[in-house]
Amino acid sequence: MHSLINKIQSKIKSNIFLDYDMRKSTWFRAGGNALGYVIVNSISDLKTIISYSDQIKYYIVGVGSNLMVRDGGFEGLIIKLGKNFNKIKINKDTLSVGAGVLDVNLAKFALQNSIKDFEFFSGIPGTIGGAIKMNAGCYGSQTADNLKRILVINKLGKIKYLTKDELELKYRSSNLTDELIVLKADFSCKYSSASEIIEKKNYIKLKRESSQPIKEKTSGSTFKNPPGEYAAALIEKAGCKGMKNGDASVSIIHSNFII
């Protein structure tokens, strides 16, 4: 398989790291090696890599904040979107955001440009691509709220737009398969005063500081809330708050966080 990866490397400009220790790129700092790890800096390179999908598996990652790698590692290529997918642009009433942009950086950009309703992203670890796939959200807001459409590429190298309705966005879910890679997203722009945006952002910050283990690197809430219930409350009722197994434990601050 290394010979195949070397063949792919010869056709792209982005560097592939062989036998990559995934502990370096996940917040849990656990798991085995991937056959290869590449930070892709162009659509051209991305197309080349996925053109070999019938010969080698691939998996797209963001910053590894919501990723657990098994001890046996991953028998394929881990792909991370690089700097050319980390751009944010404003075009009239549309905010175009690269899939590799950090959620927190989108929140900062929105504040700097007096664009409201992106404050909740300041409390979500991860990238916009991942936020779209799981319809990430918190404190009454979610990624779907202002989303208009996304640009994706499939394993055949075809690029197309998908509208918000086509994604069937629901509570922490979408119909996006692993076969589709999100390249960018277009959001609606709604303007407000900086003071109003800062007030909402500070409210979210205070809520997080008072109820979440923010001093630890976590993947956020681990389990979805079932209808009419809170996962954290159910975990506490089961007597699992503070439970430990090796170096992992259920947070005593918020039972739905694993640290």
Enumerate the language-model features and the residues they cover.
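Short capping/connector residues at structural and topological boundaries
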Residues: 27-35, 72-74, 79, 129, ...
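Structural signature of FAD isoalloxazine-binding scaffolds in flavoprotein oxidoreductases
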Residues: 38-43, 68-86, 133-164, 177-184
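Contiguous, small/hydrophobic- and glycine-enriched helical/loop subdomains that border
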Residues: 90-94, 98-104, 117, 123, ...
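A gly/ser-rich beta-alpha-beta helix-loop segment of oxidoreductase catalytic cores
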Residues: 117-148, 218, 222
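Anion-binding (especially nucleotide phosphate/pyrophosphate-binding) glycine-rich loop
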Residues: 1-128
